[in-house]
């Protein structure tokens, strides 16, 4: 009994001398947590803890940065801190009050690398445009084209048939990119083939679609920004139901149908619409352009669609841009003197020659024509691989040619 008493007194004397005030037997150890536990440097986080000295001031330490906090009567605290900008990897966060401390880890994530912005739209007089599989809403496709070409397209093709509502969301998407929409408005039902009597030219001129045409005119007028309207294109061929000689259409039917549609849209107040008359490049057997031209008062821009099919088809052979477009451009100049000329669709296959050389000549030839205002590349893998990047050499050649015409 005496020995036990002496030991107890000795221990009590030792505690007093040391000045240490340990937690009561069985008290939980200090703990600290951080929320969230991961994020980039510079993140605002909350550090909280329990089991610390009560009602006192403490410090949170993160690297060389310190943050003050005060504990509650129960030894708890919560403090907002910022992870230092230079922190990396697993960063230790320590909280302490006098002799009590505890630590946790914050995992610093690498800041995401921002996606590179696509190149800007060129202000060169020869505009570069594109049509892609996904159309105006396919931002990734348009960004890809911009990066391939070294500049963002200033014209973006949109295709709509007579059953569809005005594509206002698509127009907005194109405008947001700093480009102008080129709407190809096709008076038929997609997928229905050439023989569609309900969409014959005389039915259009007779007013069967006036409600839809007026709806478009009003919507485009309300939209208010510039839009190019390529109505009933490639009419000198025989593969669409609005061509003369097919679908019950007679010679002379095309012009009244065009003029009727034009007048309804204009009457709706859509003065922001530029009308683009866009035949196919003339070929043996195609309908003569003179009988299809609606007149200077009904057309703002004349255009051509033309492709180098190379040897991809049994009926085709390699043709360079000057030979492909030269005769048609000459006809347009005679038929519509003073009108700007647009190549509204073009591309080349790889089969039968050098696509790289073709791309280079296309840009240099068109840039040398003072009345040609632009061209639109058909960036699709369809009947042939028309894509700009069907090969590395093709993509490089077009990019370099566009750069040269800007120099």
Question: Where in the sequence are the language-model features?
Answer:
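Boundary/entry segment of secreted carbohydrate-active catalytic domains
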Residues: 111-164
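Aromatic- and acid-rich polysaccharide-binding/catalytic face
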Residues: 156-159, 289-320, 378-380
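Substrate-binding cleft of extracellular glycoside hydrolase catalytic domains
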Residues: 169-273, 277
């Amino acid at each position: 009994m005496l020995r036990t008493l002496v030991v107890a007194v000795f221990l009590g004397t030792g505690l007093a001398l040391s000045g240490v005030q340990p937690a009561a037997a069985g008290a939980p150890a200090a703990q600290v947590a951080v929320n969230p536990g991961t994020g980039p440097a510079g993140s605002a986080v909350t550090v909280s803890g329990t089991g610390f000295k009560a009602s006192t001031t403490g410090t949170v330490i993160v690297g060389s940065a310190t943050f003050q906090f005060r504990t509650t009567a129960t030894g708890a605290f919560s403090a907002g801190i910022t992870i230092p900008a230079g922190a990396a990897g697993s960063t230790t966060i320590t909280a302490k009050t006098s002799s009590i401390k505890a630590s946790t880890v914050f995992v610093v994530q690498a800041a995401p690398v921002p996606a590179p912005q696509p190149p800007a739209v060129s202000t060169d007089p020869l505009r570069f445009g594109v049509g892609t599989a996904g159309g105006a809403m396919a931002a990734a496709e348009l960004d890809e084209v911009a990066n391939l070409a070294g500049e963002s397209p200033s014209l973006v093709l949109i295709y709509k048939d007579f059953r569809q509502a005005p594509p206002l969301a698509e127009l907005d998407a194109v405008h947001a990119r700093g480009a102008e929409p080129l709407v190809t408005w096709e008076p038929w039902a997609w997928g229905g083939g050439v023989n569609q009597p309900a969409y014959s030219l005389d039915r259009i001129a007779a007013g069967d679609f006036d409600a839809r045409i007026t709806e478009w005119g009003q919507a485009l007028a309300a939209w208010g920004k510039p839009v190019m309207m390529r109505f009933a294109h490639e009419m000198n061929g025989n593969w669409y139901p609005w061509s003369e000689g097919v679908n019950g259409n007679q010679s002379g039917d095309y012009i009244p149908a065009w003029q009727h549609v034009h007048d309804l849209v204009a009457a709706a107040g859509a003065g922001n619409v530029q009308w683009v008359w866009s035949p196919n490049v003339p070929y043996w057997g195609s309908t003569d352009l003179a009988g299809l031209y609606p007149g200077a008062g009904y057309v703002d821009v004349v255009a051509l669609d033309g492709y180098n099919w190379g040897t991809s088809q049994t009926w085709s052979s390699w043709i360079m841009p000057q030979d492909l477009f030269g005769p048609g451009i000459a006809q347009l100049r005679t038929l519509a003197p003073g009108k700007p000329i647009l190549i509204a669709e073009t591309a080349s296959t790889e089969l039968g020659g050098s696509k790289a050389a073709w791309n280079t000549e296309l840009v240099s030839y068109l840039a040398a024509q003072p009345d040609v205002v632009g061209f639109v590349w058909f960036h699709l893998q369809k009947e042939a691989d028309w894509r700009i990047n069907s090969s590395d050499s093709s993509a490089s050649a077009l990019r370099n040619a566009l750069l040269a015409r800007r120099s």
